């Protein structure tokens, strides 16, 4: 079994590309059923956020990569975008190292941001619910979560956390001097939407409106805040008329706010959704300001230097954690092989022993039978090693011969 990952992220792909290859907003159960139906795919975890879409897989043959790319390409709406031009393949230890760095926030657009860990955990949970995760992937993710917890407790990588949500609010503040007199509309009540809401409430705007597909979730978030209200997405046309700032963090497959919704009133539009939820043409209207996820980079760069030192400390913890994981995996593999070896030996001994005991009970010469039993066991136990040594000798594999000699305590010098 081999461990691989295929990824499209913000480092190599601009927002329009990430939007095309995003798997968020699709039926999760359907995604898992379809990917597990591919020959040589054994287990899978699918991660899709605003900055990346990654698929982690246990496979039985590397040839399956082409089939996975075909599967992924099938969800792309615009055929001009070819996944082979953008994806990155990782294998083995590289996958685990990347996932550890990712969960610790070291691969994020905002260095050290904590939201990604929750997103990785959510992806892991969904994989388990869909019976898509196996023992090896499960051990990998458990070690990743333990590593992220250790990094958070032993470094200050998340000190004064700066997230994409926080950076979005920073952009809004730059455009509007006095947010306390403004109405803010947040679209989406997921993890990022809730974080946006909490950042906005700290600025005490005139009114905060939170729109979501299910109003119960929006009501739960807004219920403890004054001047906050929950709404259905179907109310967007009316809500936009009231809003000065519109921020979207929602999973949709097409634009839910377009130019037909807005008049001459100046507004700030910030879209951190992938795929995009707000039509970029909104920014072409003279009175509007429009930002997407990639525009947040400038804000984020201001905060990177503060976290670089803590990042180096986190890297050391991750390297140590990876070493621990690999050592444990070696032990698991060797213990499994040892257990199988003993089971094989037990099977050989039990069959011959029962035959020998039956002969003794029938009055046969015990000494002769024991000698015969010992001879038969010797032949059976040494049969496969002898065959293996002969085969290694034919192939000129002196390294295999040396290894087998060591296994049986023989002189390797001869």
UniProtKB/Swiss-Prot annotation:
Enzyme class: oxidoreductase
InterPro entries, alphabetized: 4pyrrol_synth_GluRdtase, 4pyrrol_synth_GluRdtase_dimer, 4pyrrol_synth_GluRdtase_N, GluRdtase_CS, GluRdtase_dimer_dom_sf, GluRdtase_N_sf, NAD(P)-bd_dom_sf, Shikm_DH/Glu-tRNA_Rdtase
Site (Important for activity) residue list: 98
Swiss-Prot/TrEMBL catalytic activity: (S)-4-amino-5-oxopentanoate + tRNA(Glu) + NADP(+) = L-glutamyl-tRNA(Glu) + NADPH + H(+)
Biological process according to GO: protoporphyrinogen IX biosynthetic process from glutamate
Binding site for NADP(+): 188-193
Pfam families per the UniProt record, alphabetical: GlutR_dimer, GlutR_N, Shikimate_DH
Entries under PROSITE patterns matching the protein: GLUTR
EC code(s) of this entry: 1.2.1.70
Recorded family membership: Belongs to the glutamyl-tRNA reductase family.
Protein name in UniProt: Glutamyl-tRNA reductase
Organism whose genome encodes this protein: Francisella tularensis subsp. holarctica (strain FTNF002-00 / FTA)
Name of encoding gene: hemA
């Amino acid at each position: 079994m081999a461990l691989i990952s295929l990824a499209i992220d913000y480092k190599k792909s601009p927002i329009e590309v990430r939007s095309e290859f995003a798997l968020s907003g699709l039926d999760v159960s359907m995604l898992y059923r379809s990917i597990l139906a591919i020959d040589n795919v054994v287990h899978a975890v699918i991660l899709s956020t605003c900055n990346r879409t990654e698929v982690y897989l246990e496979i039985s043959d590397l040839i399956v990569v082409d089939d996975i790319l075909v599967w992924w390409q099938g969800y792309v709406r615009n055929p001009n975008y070819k996944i082979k031009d953008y994806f990155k393949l990782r294998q083995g230890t590289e996958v685990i190292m990347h996932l550890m760095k990712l969960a610790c926030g070291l691969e994020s657009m905002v260095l050290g941001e904590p939201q990604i860990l929750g997103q990785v955990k959510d992806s892991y949970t969904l994989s388990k619910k869909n019976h898509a995760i196996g023992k090896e992937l499960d051990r990998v993710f458990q070690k990743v979560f333990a590593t992220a917890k250790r990094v958070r407790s032993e470094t200050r990588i998340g000190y004064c956390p700066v997230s994409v949500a926080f950076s979005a609010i920073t952009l809004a503040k730059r455009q509007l001097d006095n947010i306390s007199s403004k109405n803010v509309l947040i679209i989406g009540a997921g993890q990022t939407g809730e974080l946006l809401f909490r950042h906005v409430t700290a600025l005490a705007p005139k009114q905060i409106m939170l729109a979501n597909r299910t109003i119960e979730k929006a009501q739960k978030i807004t219920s403890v805040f004054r001047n906050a209200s929950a709404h259905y997405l179907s109310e967007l046309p009316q809500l936009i008329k009231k809003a000065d700032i519109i921020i979207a963090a929602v999973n949709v497959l097409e634009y839910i706010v377009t130019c037909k919704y807005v008049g001459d009133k100046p507004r700030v539009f910030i879209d951190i959704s992938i795929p995009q939820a707000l039509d970029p043409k909104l920014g072409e209207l003279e009175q509007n300001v429009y930002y997407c996820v990639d525009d947040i980079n400038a804000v984020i760069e201001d905060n990177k230097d503060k976290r670089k030192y803590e990042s180096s400390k986190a890297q050391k913890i991750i390297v140590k954690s990876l070493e621990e994981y690999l050592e444990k995996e070696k032990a698991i593999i060797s213990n499994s092989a040892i257990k199988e070896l003993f089971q094989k030996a037990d099977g050989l001994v039990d069959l011959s022993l029962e035959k020998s005991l039956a002969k003794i009970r029938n009055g046969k010469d015990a000494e002769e039978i024991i000698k015969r039993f010992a001879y038969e066991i010797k032949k059976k136990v040494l049969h496969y090693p002898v065959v293996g040594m002969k085969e290694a000798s034919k192939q000129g594999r002196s390294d295999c011969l040396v290894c087998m000699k060591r296994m049986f305590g023989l002189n390797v010098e001869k």
